[in-house]
């Protein structure tokens, strides 16, 4: 049996509804190994345990709201230093100077969202793809892969729709084969 996938969710303190949406997205992913999840500690909670988890997690998921508040910077740096894959989401709100600086200096593509439900859909697809990308290392079974592909494929199929009808035709009953010579 595979070990649970270790996910650390680093988030701004102002994102209560968004953290709930992320939890729903994670719970909805059809994978057998399950999850071990830790979050950014709240004010007054011990940060050392969370930081140790970050360094050994499989994925870091960052959700940025109005502020890039402590200890988000330590969580980010710990994951980057350990070479962990990062999924980054940014709420379209007025950002503090610290959040603006984080958006500028981090070397990651931020996915923007406006509402918790939009974030849930984005995290479902993004996390499904991130888990698929590491499927062998995470010990996914074929059933896990099929379930995750079903979540990712609809988006891929929309992107690849042909512009018009397919007008390719065969040679019918005849054909010519040309041998290429240089």
Language model features by range: what are they?
Residues 92-182:
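C-terminal interaction surface of TIR/SEFIR-family domains
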């Amino acid at each position: 049996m595979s070990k649970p996938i270790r996910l650390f969710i680093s988030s701004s303190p102002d994102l209560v509804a968004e953290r709930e949406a992320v939890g729903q997205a994670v719970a909805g992913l059809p994978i057998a190994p399950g999850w071990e999840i830790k979050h950014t500690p709240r004010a007054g909670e011990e940060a050392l345990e969370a930081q140790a988890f970050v360094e050994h997690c499989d994925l870091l998921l960052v959700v940025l709201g109005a502020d890039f508040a402590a200890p988000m910077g330590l969580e980010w740096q710990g994951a980057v230093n350990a070479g962990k894959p990062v999924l980054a989401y940014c709420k379209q709100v007025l950002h503090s100077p610290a959040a603006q600086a984080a958006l500028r200096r981090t070397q990651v593509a931020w996915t923007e969202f406006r509402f918790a439900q939009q974030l849930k859909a984005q995290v479902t697809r993004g996390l499904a793809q991130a888990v698929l990308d590491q499927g062998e290392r995470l010990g996914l079974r074929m059933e896990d892969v099929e379930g995750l592909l079903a979540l990712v494929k609809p988006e891929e199929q929309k992107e690849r729709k042909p512009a018009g009808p397919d007008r390719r035709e065969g040679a019918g009953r005849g054909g010519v084969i040309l041998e290429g010579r240089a």
